[in-house]
Amino acid sequence: MLQFTDTHVNVESGKNVDAFTTIKKIMTIEKPDLVVLTGDVATDGNPEKTYKEFEAIFTEAKMPWIVTLGNHDSQADLSRKEVADFLQNLNYCLNNDQGETYGHSNFVYPVRSTDNKNKALIYVMDSNAYSTLKPEVDGWGWFDNSQVSWYKEKSREFTQLNNNRPLPAIAFFHIPLPEYYQAWKNKKVKAIGKRKEQECGPEINTGMFAAMLEAKDVMGTFVGHDHNNDYIGVHYNMALAYGRVTKTKTYNKAPIEGGRIIVLKEGKRSFDTWIREVNGKKVYPCTWPDSFVE
C-alpha cells in the first residue's frame, strides 16, 4: 500500500495542486493495491471539489483509497462529520465509518487472502484536531477514551475469530502518538529516516499505544502531521512511522515530496517499507522487525 500525507490541496485557488502529479507519478512507479491519505488533505476552500479531483485520479487508476482526517481537514466549508460522510460516497473510497465511537472515519479494513479469510487488519482512526481542554491544555487533539475502548473491542473481536491469535495489523491516523519521540530517542535501536522538527503530538496521553501493545496485533502505526519528519523507529518493538509529506509548498526545509510504501507479508508478522520520492528515488528501505533488532 502507498501512504501520502499532508497534501493541503485547494483546487479553487490552485494551492498545492502539483501534489496530484506527485501522486500519479509514484502510483505509476509503485503500482500499489491501496492508497491511504493520512490527513490534512483538502484544508481550505471547497473541499468537495478537491476530493472530487482525488476521486477522478483514483477512479482512472481503478485504485481503492482511504482517508484519515487531519487537524486541518475541518477548517474549510465542511465539518469533520460532513467530510467523513462525503468521502464514503466517492468512487473507490473504502471509508466506512459506522459511528461506533468518538470522532469520524474510525473503521477496520480486513485484508483477505484468495480464500477470503482475514489475514491482516488495517485500522483507520481519527486522531482528532485540537485540544478539547483549552485553555488549561493547549495543542493538538488526542484519541478519546471511547476510541481506545473501541480499538480494544475490535481487536478482541478479530482475535477471537482467528482462534484467539492476533492478526497482523497496522494503523493509520494523522497526529503522532506521544510515544513517537521515545522511538526516535531509542538508543538501542536506531530509527531510519529524518527528524527535522519536534514531534507535534498531543499533550494528553489516553493510552492508545499501551492498548495496542497489550492487544498484540498492531505491528506499526503510520502518521503525517509533522511535514519535516519521515522516520520509522520502534518503541517496545512496535514500529512508529511517519509518511513523507506530499504537498509541494511546505514550511521550512521539508524533504522532497513523496510517499511511503508498506508491503505486508501474508501469514507473517512482518512488513517492508520505504520512501519513494517524486524524482523516482527510493530511500530508507527497511523491514520490520528485522531492521530493528537490538
Report residues per predicted region:
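N-terminal active-site segment of His-dependent metallophosphoesterases
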Residues: M1-E53
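Active-site-proximal beta-strand elements of phosphoester/diester hydrolases
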Residues: M1-V11, K119-N128, F172, A239-V245
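Divalent metal-coordination and catalytic microenvironments
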Residues: D6, I23, V35, D40, ...
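Active-site environment of divalent metal-dependent phosphoester hydrolases
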Residues: N10-E12, T43-E48, V67-L78, Y130-L133, ...
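Extracellular/periplasmic catalytic domains that process cell-envelope and extracellular macromolecules
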Residues: A19, T28-I29, F58-A61, E100-Y102, ...
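His/acidic metal-ligating clusters that form di-metal
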Residues: K31-D33, L121-V124, E136-D230
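Extended active-site neighborhood of metal-dependent phosphoesterases/phosphodiesterases
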Residues: K52-N163, R260-K265
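Binuclear metal-dependent phosphoesterase catalytic core
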Residues: V108-N116, M208-A215, N229-E294
